[in-house]
């Protein structure tokens, strides 16, 4: 019979550092999957001869696939284990990334992006599950915090790297980079990551249980109080993400090589806000801190609309509004 310590730490202590590196890689997969090809959106519209709204479906379908997969990845890993679900998910990510890179038309690219999201989601969901499996509860929060500090580099460096890939190699290069990153993670999981779910639940995927659990969550007022502000904030961020390159490069004539820096500056406001939030939470509490943040976002958006109403149209206005929002 396994001891309680074994149940909490199925991974040997000497392997914790490689596991932490893997967790960082898993968490970086999602922002890099979106940010790395943003500078290529105007080029995609030109190459395939489609309107900007069609090109933006490559991002919308990724978000839809990523969101939907969260409902099934967790239960599947609870039943079959983290390792097999992760291996299948990363293999799907690599194949889908190669399909994106080789896509002869926009239709296949949109479908491949949806499949890419399914594989990407497995890495994100299982990364957090591995933390719960491999680390004691007192340590898991610190592990996530440490991984998240490295994660902040992805939305800062991803668009910059993607801009140079677009300028140097064209739009397919970003998806080739995705496939290389996915293949490296797949090899690392296969060679280095043992199974961390030592107590598999054969009933985790039963439909009745899933429906009951979803009902409990959806019926909780606390869930909606926290989920709705987060969803609205997330939606506004993706509205900027999906249109930023098209507006900055096509409309405001920002050079493609400079797009990544503009985007990174806007994202730095989000990262700075998280630092400020951590300082405000102990002093004001969650509810008051959320009100302060919401009021600042509303004020920034209103100032942006007022500036547009006065006829101002400059790339710095767009980037500045995103930084403040």
Language model regions located:
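Helix-breaking motifs and short loop linkers at transmembrane-helix boundaries and internal kinks
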Residues: 47-49, 81, 102-108, 119, ...
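Cytoplasmic helix-loop-helix junction between adjacent transmembrane helices
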Residues: 112-153
């Amino acid at each position: 019979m396994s001891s309680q310590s074994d149940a909490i730490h199925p991974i040997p202590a000497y392997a914790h550092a490689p596991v932490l590196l893997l967790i960082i890689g898993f968490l970086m997969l999602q922002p890099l999957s979106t940010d790395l090809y943003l500078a290529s959106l105007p080029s995609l519209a030109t190459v395939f001869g489609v309107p900007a709204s069609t090109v933006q479906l490559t991002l919308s379908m990724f978000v839809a696939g990523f969101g939907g997969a969260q409902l099934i990845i967790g239960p599947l890993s609870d039943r079959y284990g983290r390792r097999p679900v992760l291996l299948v998910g990363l293999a799907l990510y690599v194949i889908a990334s190669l399909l994106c890179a080789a896509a002869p038309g926009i239709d296949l690219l949109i479908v491949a992006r949806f499949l890419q999201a399914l594989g990407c989601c497995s890495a994100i969901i299982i990364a957090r599950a591995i933390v719960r499996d491999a680390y004691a509860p007192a340590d898991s929060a610190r592990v996530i915090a440490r991984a998240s500090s490295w994660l902040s580099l992805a939305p800062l460096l991803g668009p910059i790297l993607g801009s140079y890939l677009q300028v140097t190699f064209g739009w397919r290069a970003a998806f080739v980079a995705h496939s290389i990153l996915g293949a490296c993670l797949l090899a690392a999981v296969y060679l280095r990551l043992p199974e961390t779910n030592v107590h598999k639940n054969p009933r985790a995927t039963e439909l009745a249980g899933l429906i009951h659990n979803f009902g409990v969550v959806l019926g909780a007022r606390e869930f909606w109080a926290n989920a709705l502000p987060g969803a609205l904030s997330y939606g506004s961020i993706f509205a900027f993400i999906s249109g930023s390159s098209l507006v900055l490069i096509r409309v405001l004539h920002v050079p493609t090589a400079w797009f990544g820096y503009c985007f990174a500056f806007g994202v730095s406001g989000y990262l700075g806000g998280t630092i400020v939030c951590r300082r405000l939470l102990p002093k004001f509490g969650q509810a008051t801190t959320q009100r302060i943040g919401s009021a600042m976002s509303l004020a920034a958006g209103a100032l942006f609309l007022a500036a547009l109403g006065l006829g101002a149209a400059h790339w710095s206005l767009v980037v500045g509004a995103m930084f403040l929002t």
